[in-house]
């Protein structure tokens, strides 16, 4: 099975397109409801439980198999990434189509033009060099002489480069039966607090008991902003006064989380990079307090980066990697950029997995990152247009 066909079969089913659109519209209505009031968590929880009961009943009644349910979920994810990456997709596909139309033959001029295109898309110099070198070898190995025949290989190599370190590294280190501590770091203005609120909503929807710790005690309004999110999604927020010691906030939060049987504690931190040494000392102090009370914690240190800042996001990631052990990236505002290639640069040059991406403003627009979902969103039109109809209707073994 071709790579394009596999992605199309997984993420896009034309015969289900209308139903999928209705499902997404219904999801949007449901997830916008909390914006009307700050106290909607109980009704949300009941609704989600009813959804789960409904799905279980469908399984029991034989109306929907687990495989069918998983297929529908994959299509929903594909639609989310397709919608959220619309700007990047239009940019990538238009430039690649123009490139393939201009350069018909596979030669060094074509590869140099491809390098320039990818660098302009924020893929990152080192990653681009590796990707294009791989394509040169692939073209030689398969004796490809027409650039059009490299279209699928380009997309496939992007996935391979992302997954070459560890295909499973994008999974969160969350375990049942323990207090899981997530430390959020990042500069001000990239959507760190919003990400915390959406993460809390996501885990609460999965049946987890969630608590937030307002550890950004220096930025004016940061504590109040986190409290608004806590009220909106229906979770407790542990706080002290503005200017207080962030480590003391963490100490109080961990004790409260243990007393209340919390599954996941998400901790906000200050987002200042003016003085790297001060930031390092502050984060180390916070981590010491956490690890004394919860062995091996924090279990995740997530760095929030704004996709719209382009290569500046890469510089921020490098700076934070120097001051603390970042375990994953949350790339926010990916829907607001036409240069979605920064995902590859972060993964390949810093060896930090992207664990979540922000694909819009709704609560459920924070999605777990997956390399195949990402490239589908980035090249969906190209993928669907370049799967031959004969491949849809004939068995794969037929000549």
Residue ranges and their predicted role:
Residues 1-160, 170, 177-178, 382-399:
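Non-catalytic terminal/linker segments enriched in charged/polar, low-complexity residues
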Residues 126, 155-399:
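P-loop/Walker A NTP-binding module and the surrounding RecA-like catalytic core of P-loop NTPases
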């Amino acid at each position: 099975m071709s790579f394009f066909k596999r992605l199309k079969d997984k993420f896009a089913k034309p015969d289900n397109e209308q139903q999928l659109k209705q499902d997404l519209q219904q999801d949007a209505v449901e997830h916008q409801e909390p914006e009307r009031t700050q106290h909607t968590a109980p009704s949300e929880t009941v609704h989600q439980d009813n959804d789960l009961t409904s799905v279980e009943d469908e399984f029991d009644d034989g109306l929907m198999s687990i495989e069918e349910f998983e297929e529908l979920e994959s299509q929903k994810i594909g639609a989310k990434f397709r919608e959220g990456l619309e700007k990047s997709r239009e940019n990538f596909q238009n430039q690649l189509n123009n490139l393939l139309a201009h350069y018909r033959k596979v030669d060094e001029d074509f590869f140099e033009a491809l390098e320039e295109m990818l660098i302009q898309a924020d893929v990152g110099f080192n990653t681009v060099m590796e990707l294009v070198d791989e394509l040169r070898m692939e073209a030689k190995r398969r004796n490809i002489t027409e650039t059009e025949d490299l279209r699928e290989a380009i997309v496939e190599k992007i996935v391979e480069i992302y997954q070459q370190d560890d295909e499973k590294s994008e999974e969160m280190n969350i375990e049942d039966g323990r207090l899981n501590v997530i430390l959020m770091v990042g500069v001000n203005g990239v959507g760190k607090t919003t990400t915390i609120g959406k993460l809390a909503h996501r885990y609460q929807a999965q049946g987890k008991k969630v608590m937030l710790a307002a550890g950004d005690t220096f930025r004016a309004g940061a504590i109040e902003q986190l409290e608004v999110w806590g009220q909106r999604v229906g979770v407790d927020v542990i706080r002290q006064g503005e200017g207080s010691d962030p480590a003391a906030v963490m100490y109080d939060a961990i004790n409260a989380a243990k007393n209340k049987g919390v599954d996941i504690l998400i901790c906000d931190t200050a987002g200042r990079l003016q003085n790297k040494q001060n930031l390092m000392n502050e984060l180390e102090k916070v981590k010491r307090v956490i690890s004394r009370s919860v062995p091996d914690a924090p279990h995740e240190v997530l760095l929030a980066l704004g996709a719209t800042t382009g290569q500046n996001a890469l510089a921020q990631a490098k700076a934070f990697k120097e001051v603390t052990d970042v375990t994953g990236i949350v790339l926010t505002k990916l829907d607001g950029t036409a240069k979605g290639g920064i995902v590859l640069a972060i993964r390949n040059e810093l060896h930090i997995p992207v664990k979540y991406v922000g694909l819009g403003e709704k609560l459920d627009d924070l999605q777990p990152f997956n390399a195949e979902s990402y490239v589908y969103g980035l090249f969906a039109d190209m993928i669907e247009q370049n799967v031959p109809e004969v491949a849809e209707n004939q068995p794969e073994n037929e000549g």
